[in-house]
Design a protein with these regions (language model features):
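Short alpha-helical segments enriched in small residues
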Residues: 6-188
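Helix N-cap motif at beta-to-alpha junctions
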Residues: 1-5
Length: 188
């Protein structure tokens, strides 16, 4: 592009073509883009457990305005009453840690009244990421070497903006078993 108008046209064409993959220009980081998407679309995010909180809190606490869209555990897993209610819901779940985590994500989202609830299940080689909404949950398994926190932030950004999730991220309706292939680490 040789002129400002041509550059603008090329930028718009790229943004239209790769809307879900592009999250910002210049110095914008993924965490800033996720917070901006939550704020722009008036969405509230909570974490259902301390593991997800650990992934997100350290990154989000440095972003201006994050407290408007993320509870930093205050209304969710760090609140003793909410934690007790979440544990009561999860203790009745059969089938192992994955269905239990899915139930915990759904319960946190409903108890707090948030738009999204994040959760994670750390395993030896990988981490299963959950991002729950009212009707279901996005699930993605990521190798620990692939920075699960950034994948979770990308899932949040895409969900808050109404964009399609990255390939390898599965939509899971509540009450249904998660397919085994969704619990295998995805590579790009």
């Amino acid at each position: 592009a040789e002129t400002p108008a041509a550059l603008s046209k090329a930028r718009k064409a790229l943004a239209d073509r790769f809307a879900a993959e592009l999250y910002g220009e210049g110095e914008m980081t993924l965490v800033h883009a996720a917070v901006q998407a939550l704020e722009t679309h008036h969405r509230l995010l909570v974490c259902c457990d301390a593991d997800a909180g650990t992934l997100l809190e350290a990154r989000m606490e440095t972003v201006a305005g994050a407290e408007k869209v993320f509870d930093f555990g205050a209304m969710s897993y760090a609140d003793a009453k909410v934690r007790e209610k979440l544990s009561a819901k999860v203790c009745r779940v059969k089938g192992g840690p994955v269905p239990a985590k899915l139930t915990r994500v759904r319960a946190a989202q409903r108890l707090v009244g948030a738009d999204f609830a994040a959760g994670c299940l750390e395993r030896a080689e990988d981490t299963v990421l959950f991002l729950g909404s009212r009707k279901g949950c996005w699930v993605r398994t990521v190798a620990n070497a692939d920075t699960p926190a950034l994948w979770l932030l990308d899932m949040i950004r895409r969900a808050a903006s109404g964009l399609p999730q990255a390939a390898g991220t599965r939509w899971q309706k509540y009450g249904r078993a998660i397919p085994a292939d969704a619990l295998t680490a995805q590579r790009l």
